[in-house]
């Protein structure tokens, strides 16, 4: 009898429910390809890419302009050297 009382008191309650996480199919929910958040992300990414390309174009134009100026300076210096060597 004492053995039964001890074993009943030492048992821990067992919960048969198991916690589990459910993940969506995509990063913003599994609403599929028409998900408005997904469209927003694509639009933002396109705007950022456009901005980056514009910045690169401006930098490239600036570098090309500098290259033209340096070529002119180089040509002038070469002409001076040629005139002095004659």
From Swiss-Prot:
UniProt transit peptide range: 1-23
Pfam family, one: IATP
GO-annotated molecular function: ATPase binding; ATPase inhibitor activity
Gene responsible for this protein: STF1
GO cellular component, one term: mitochondrion
Origin: domain of life: Eukaryota
Stored InterPro entries: ATPase_inhibitor_mt (IPR007648)
UniProt keyword list: Mitochondrion, Phosphoprotein, Transit peptide
In-chain residues carrying the UniProt-annotated modification Phosphoserine: 24
Oligomeric form and interacting partners: Monomer and homodimer. Monomeric at pH 5.0 and dimeric at either pH 6.5 or 8.0. The protein aggregates increasingly strongly with increasing pH.
SUPFAM superfamilies: F1 ATPase inhibitor, IF1, C-terminal domain
Family label: Belongs to the ATPase inhibitor family.
Cellular localisation: Mitochondrion
Name used for this protein in its record: F(1)-ATPase inhibitor STF1, mitochondrial
Main location as per UniProt: mitochondrion
Organism of origin: Saccharomyces cerevisiae (strain ATCC 204508 / S288c)
Biological role stated in the UniProt entry: Endogenous low-affinity ATPase inhibitor, which inhibits specifically the reverse ATPase reaction of mitochondrial F(1)F(0)-type ATP synthase. Found to stabilize, together with STF2, a complex of intrinsic ATPase inhibitor INH1 and proton-translocating ATPase in mitochondrial membranes. Binds directly to purified F1-ATPase.
Presence of the UniProt keyword Phosphoprotein in the record: yes
């Amino acid at each position: 009898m004492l053995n039964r009382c001890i074993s009943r008191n030492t048992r821990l309650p067992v919960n048969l429910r198991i916690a589990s996480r459910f993940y969506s199919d995509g990063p913003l929910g599994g609403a599929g390809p028409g998900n408005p958040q997904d469209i927003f992300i694509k639009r933002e990414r396109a705007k950022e890419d456009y901005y980056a390309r514009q910045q690169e174009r401006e930098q490239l134009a600036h570098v090309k302009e500098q290259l033209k100026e340096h070529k002119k300076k180089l040509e002038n210096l070469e002409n001076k050297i040629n005139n002095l060597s004659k």
